[in-house]
């Protein structure tokens, strides 16, 4: 009778293995679990990231959404973001990079996957940048949200001008837009489709920066 704990996942096994060898190979201490290298492109939303991880056999979309929504990841910059229960709370915090992940596994494996990407974000946002943001009156969440607006509102050619527009509208409530950012990309994120001018006044969402002043609830 096997006493080792079997870890769920995808394994590379040899057909010549006997029973004990098979169990040993699938124990939590085993190095035989199959891995896959995945590149998360810049600009991917959480939905796109989860779909990619599912496609590559790392975890299912459902498991990733559940973990993202309900697991309390212990990073200070996640305090005060969207509440537990909404997987979009990790939007903007899953750092785009190339990772090596184990294939398969349940909730605990999904926690490790997401924690790895959040940790990579943490490593790319040093204390000096956090202090600079605080001195400007912004939280890490604010800065990540602003950066996502800049990235999604442009094709990469005029990010400086878009950044200037956003900060002017945030810092000067008497600016011509009186606190409304009027960022189309945020409304596209909210609706998940191509928008029309009619949507500016009809889509009731905090991501509609034509109807709601200031920053949307989080990155897009």
Residue spans for each PLM region:
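Signal peptide-directed extracytoplasmic domains
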Residues: 1-124
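Bacterial extracytoplasmic/cell-wall-associated proteins, especially those involved in peptidoglycan
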Residues: 57-59, 73-220
């Amino acid at each position: 009778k096997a006493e080792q704990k079997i870890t769920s996942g995808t394994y590379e096994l040899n057909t010549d293995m006997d029973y004990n060898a098979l169990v040993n190979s699938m124990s939590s201490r085993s190095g035989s679990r199959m891995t896959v290298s995945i590149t998360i492109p810049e600009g991917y939303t959480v939905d796109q990231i989860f779909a990619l991880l599912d496609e590559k056999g790392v975890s299912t979309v459902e498991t990733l959404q559940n973990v993202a929504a309900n697991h309390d990841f212990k990073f200070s910059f996640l305090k005060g973001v969207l509440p537990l229960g909404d997987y979009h709370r990790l939007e903007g915090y899953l750092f785009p990079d190339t990772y090596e992940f184990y294939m398969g596994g349940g909730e605990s494996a999904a926690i490790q996957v997401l924690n790895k990407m959040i940790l990579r974000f943490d490593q790319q946002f040093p204390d000096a940048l956090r202090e600079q943001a605080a001195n400007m009156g912004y939280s890490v969440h604010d800065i990540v949200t602003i950066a996502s607006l800049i990235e999604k509102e442009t094709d990469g050619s005029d990010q400086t001008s878009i950044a200037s527009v956003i900060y002017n509208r945030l810092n000067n409530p008497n600016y011509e837009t009186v606190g409304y950012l009027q960022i189309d990309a945020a409304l596209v994120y909210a609706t998940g489709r191509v928008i029309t001018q009619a949507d500016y006044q009809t889509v009731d969402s905090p991501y509609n920066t034509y109807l709601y002043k200031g920053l949307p609830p989080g990155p897009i």
